[in-house]
Amino acid sequence: MVIAIKKGQLVKAIVCEEFGKISDIKWKDVDNPNINEEEVLIRVLAAGVNYPDSLIVQGLYQFKPMVPFSPGHEGAGIVERVGTNVTGFKEGDRVFFLTNFGAFSEKISVHYTQAFHLGLKVSFEVGASAFMTYGTSYHALVQRANISANKKVLVLGGAGGVGLAAIDIAKSFGSEVVAVVSNKKKANLCKEYGADKTIIIDDSLDEKSLTEVLKTQAGSRSE
């Protein structure tokens, strides 16, 4: 069963009408999304912008939605409608969500298992930027590397979203963290997130020289 939204209602969205340049996406009116019995309708108040969003617009991502579509993998907002089979959510709940695309819209419908409650002390902006950064780092460090307190973790691109999340997660496990960055400002940011040591890399270094610097300053047991 589909719960229909009143016809004529429109919402604003960033729309990719055909794969191509990022500059070709448009801000336009689209139909208010319907929901089925296992979906929730969310009024989006914040959305995360990530590298895969640029790839999907250009048709370079691992899957291609049917055009036109609205990009955006993650966001946060307020539940406005719930499907008849949805459990754990009600209208008015604060949530953050993960989706393949569609977050760059005023409203989105997602399966209720893709939405999660957002604490009152957590802003919509923070909730909307958590999945792609912390999710990526958690998968790499916890699910793949089996991180533990006796490991030393080397984080390349330490001052980026995924890098900062990696520092945060690694420190929560008691690991020693070395962050690699390109300037002092980024190094200071990594230290604020808990990095034990930072390495500032000169962009002019070739691959061999870079490897030697990392071995010397980070240590051979860094992962």
PLM feature segments, named:
Residues 31-49, 60-102:
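Glycine-rich beta-strand-centered segment in the early N-terminal region that forms part
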Residues 164:
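Residues forming the Rossmann-fold NAD(P)(H) cofactor-binding site
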Residues 1-11:
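Eukaryotic N-terminal low-complexity, Ser/Thr- and Lys/Arg-rich leader segments
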Residues 159, 167:
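N-terminal Rossmann NAD(P)H-binding glycine-rich loop of SDR-like oxidoreductase domains
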Residues 55, 94-157:
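NAD(P)H dinucleotide-binding glycine-rich loop of Rossmann-like/cofactor-binding domains
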Residues 155, 171-223:
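Adenosine-nucleotide cofactor-binding segment
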